Design a protein with these regions (language model features):
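N-terminal glycine/threonine-rich, aromatic-flanked beta-hairpin/loop signature
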Residues: 50-120
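Tryptophan-anchored aromatic micro-motifs
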Residues: 28-56, 66, 187-207
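Generic hydrophobic, helix-prone segments enriched in Leu/Val/Ile
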Residues: 1, 95, 144-148
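Surface-exposed coil/turn segments at beta-strand junctions on protein surfaces, enriched
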Residues: 37-39, 60, 139
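N-terminal, intrinsically disordered, polar/charged segments of Gram-positive cell-envelope systems
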Residues: 1-46
Length: 208
């Protein structure tokens, strides 16, 4: 039940094992095009792969999304915050107008981006200085592209692929020439946001 599998079924794959799945998909989406319900199967993350900071969010079936951003600078201390400084935000909004560009590429709009705390607000608790910020990764534009598994890597700018290469290609040579995961692209800022399969509440409970 992957987006890649849906693509293969929609484009006449010879694999007949997914016939029941394709019937189920057809009942949900007559056109066979990508829906927000497809994207709701994934969690999305924007980070460098080196740890320290990340932006994480999930999209629901209606296009709404919710997530958080965090970064830390434990060396940035003061009299009241000897344990360092944290940058963070909680955010929510909605993606709309999911439009097909080609077999592997869609475009969508972002609306109503709101924050749990006002960006710029600061507070100190438990020896840590908390600074609330804008969300890193979704700024600078209200238009985003979605690239699906199978999309040629050459369709992405070097700046964008830099952010997702480590999640997309586990070969030492870096020879993967197509996407293996869905990604969201902020072209205005040159950001690529990778994805992984979303856990169910039961799976999340088991992993904690």
């Amino acid at each position: 039940d992957t987006i890649q599998g849906d693509i293969e079924e929609n484009h006449g794959s010879d694999d007949t094992e997914g016939s029941s799945d394709s019937a189920e998909n057809a009942s949900e989406n007559q056109s066979g095009d990508l829906t927000f319900a497809d994207l709701a199967k994934y969690s999305f993350e924007f980070c460098s792969g080196a740890g320290g900071w990340s932006t994480d969010f999930e999209i629901e079936k209606d296009g709404s999304f919710k997530g958080s951003y965090h970064d830390s600078d434990m060396g940035d201390t003061g009299d009241d915050y000897e344990n360092g400084t944290m940058y963070l935000c909680g955010f929510s909004g909605k993606f709309t107008d999911l439009t097909k560009i080609n077999d592997y590429t869609y475009q969508m709009k972002m609306e109503n981006l709101t924050y749990d705390e006002t960006p710029g607000k600061e507070e100190i608790a438990d020896g840590v200085k908390y600074i609330y910020t804008d969300v890193y990764g979704l700024e600078g534009t209200d238009t985003f592209k979605v690239y699906l598994p199978g999309a040629p890597v050459r369709d992405l700018s070097e700046d964008v692929y830099f952010w997702v290469r480590w999640a997309n290609d586990d070969s030492e040579e870096g020879t993967q020439d197509t996407l293996t995961i869905p990604i969201i692209v902020n072209e205005e800022m040159g950001y690529g946001i990778y994805s992984y399969e979303r856990q169910t509440p039961y799976e999340e409970a088991q992993s904690t």
